[in-house]
Amino acid sequence: MGELSEPPNGHVKNSVSWQTAHLKTRPKHFSTDILIAGGGLGGVAAALGALRRGRHVFLTEEYDWLGGQLTSQAVPPDEHTWVEQFGVTRSYRALRDGIRQYYRDNYPLTEEARRRAQLNPGAGHVSKLCHEPRVAVAVIEAMLMPFIGSGLLTVKKRVKAVSCEMVGQVVRSVEFRKLDDGGTFTVDAKYVIDATELGDLLPITKTPYVTGFESRKDTGEPSAPEEAQPQNSQAVSICFAVDHIEGEDHTIPKPERYDHWRSCHPDFWGAPLLGLKAPHPRTLEIVEREFTPNPNDDPASVISDQRKSGGDMNLWTFRRIAAKDNFIPGVYRSDICLVNWPMIDYFEKPIIDVSEAELQERLAEAASLSYSMLYYLQTDCPRADGKGTGYPGLRLRGDITGTEHGLAMAPYVRESRRIEAITTVVEQDLSLDVRGSKGAVHYPDSVGVGMYRIDLHPSTGGDNYIDVACYPFEIPLGALIPVERPNLLAASKNIGTTHITNGCYRLHPVEWNIGEAAGLLAAHCLDKELSPHEVRGKKQLFQEFQDMIIREGIETEWPDVSGY
């Protein structure tokens, strides 16, 4: 069959018009049972929880991909030692199992890798399941697809909340702006869940919240300062993926601010920011990391166990998301390394409660730091093989992160606005040093569990790492419920933690558990015609709710395990 001739101009015009004519008639007002703003891990889990209970859900997301820190932010999952056995929800385990099965069904794995029960596609040291972000996107979409087909779930991407309508203390509706064309629409909802990365709904709804570092006077935390520091937040990072093709030159143009970042020498860093030296998070000793692309290690021999080691001394394998030797020879020319390292932590200025112009300017600075680190690796980094400086074969893999600019689609946000909650989790609830042999505090209103060391990155207030060993902990329902706003729930890093305890509640499986509990709570309140405060406040009502979430696959307490 020959090439198609160009159709008449009128046909071209009509072919465009039928695709765009409906835009003027698209609805600008929606109603739903539960509105979830933010399609990160907390938002997705909240949606799944509510949908399984038969509720209509409207889910919005600022970026093209659902999944937040796991996908658009490109961060492989930070998980605890026992993740393969217990300590996560049933649906989070389904997500993990789905990712592994996706590789087995669609990737040319070696037979040995395919048979491995605990397949780690990237053989990264940070997690037992390091993988390419697109795979998680596909699995999340598949988990939600039946509910879209049934009409229970509506998803709107590339939108952001801009205003709301309140009736007394109740959030009646939220208005969203479309990022592509500037249009707006409004969603009425009986319950509203804030699962955004920065707690966007809190200032919009005038829900009382906290930012930055609380004072010791307010929280009693031993690691807190004497005075509150509301502008002192953890660094944000814009991650990126690279591979390395020896003999080729993929050097990017020199970033405009490269000289600035090359000369940056933070007082507490003990070395230039761009380099292989940085403080050790647990000891603060200045340690030089290894960087050797494609070390040809055996993927099956990699041990990923945060209890034994953070895994970050070898930067290439730390967060590697594709180990080429897991795949049939010749398919991958190189491993793929995900760069989320101390050297790209942007801690010059905060990004919370600033103007939109300031936010974009600071994120641009964070991006320039990431590009500069890549350029340093390509040109100035001392080579481990002694062959001078620079690895020009390092290739930026924007195709892996879904962007033309090459970096991750979204910034990796470690800290959010946090609600003034019924319950605030504090350091002394779970710190090994404070608790001694007693284990973490048991919350009678537990709706989940989590575990990670309290891990705070350098901050905009000039603080170095704060790294505190802790016990496996519980998630109190009271931390998801604001003191005010009876139909608003928190479902991400915006729950009732502190600057310090957010450092262990912000990780992937914990955020998922928080979101799932929030979605189940909203659905339960609608089913029983109760408020969240009533469910938590009366023992019998809470027990009924807790029994339900346990049946839904949420673990609410730990077996006898030790902290680290």
Residue locations for each model-derived region?
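Small-residue (primarily alanine) positions within well-ordered alpha-helices
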Residues: 46-51, 518-522
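Short, well-ordered alpha-helix to beta-strand connector turns
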Residues: 32, 54, 189-190
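Conserved N-terminal/central alpha/beta ligand/cofactor-binding core
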Residues: 2-14, 23, 49, 55-56, ...
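Flavin (FAD/FMN)-binding glycine-rich loop and adjacent Rossmann-like elements that form
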Residues: 4-18, 25, 69, 157-158, ...
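N-terminal Rossmann-fold NAD(P) dinucleotide-binding loop
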Residues: 43
